[in-house]
Amino acid sequence: MYIKSVENLYKKYNGKTLADDIYAVSREYNNFQNAFNRMAKDIAANINAEVVKTLKGHYYGSMFFKRGNRYVYVHYGNSINRTHIDFGNNTWSSFIYCRTAKSDSDYTGGTNNFVTLNELADKIDKLLG
């Protein structure tokens, strides 16, 4: 499905390596995290769901989507090079993965689904049933 904010985030950040302030999240990466969270809210609105919890970690982030009584956990971040953004990879080293969850505190739920940014909305929608 097409969502303008997904396209905008992709164009702005894909392939970029953001500033790394080592001991603290850089302002540039924090701006990226904020943009990712805004995009997630747009995805939720497009699939009749809501973002019920977000976490901004040290060069990674996560969130929970909810529709009815079903939850999906989404994690983003690069485990190999923490400040490099690669939205096009959907393998085990993917920047984004999602899975079913039992609640908005279930960080170990179902099987990881590695997705590209462009696949994310459809995968969340499918996992929410």
Indicate where each model-derived feature is located.
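Generic structural signal of hydrophobic/aromatic residues within well-ordered alpha-helices
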Residues: 6-9, 120, 124
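Negatively charged, low-complexity tracts enriched in Asp/Glu with abundant Ser/Thr
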Residues: 2-69, 104
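Intrinsically disordered, low-complexity regulatory segments enriched in Ser/Thr/Pro
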Residues: 55-122
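Short intrinsically disordered terminal tails
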Residues: 1-2, 126-129
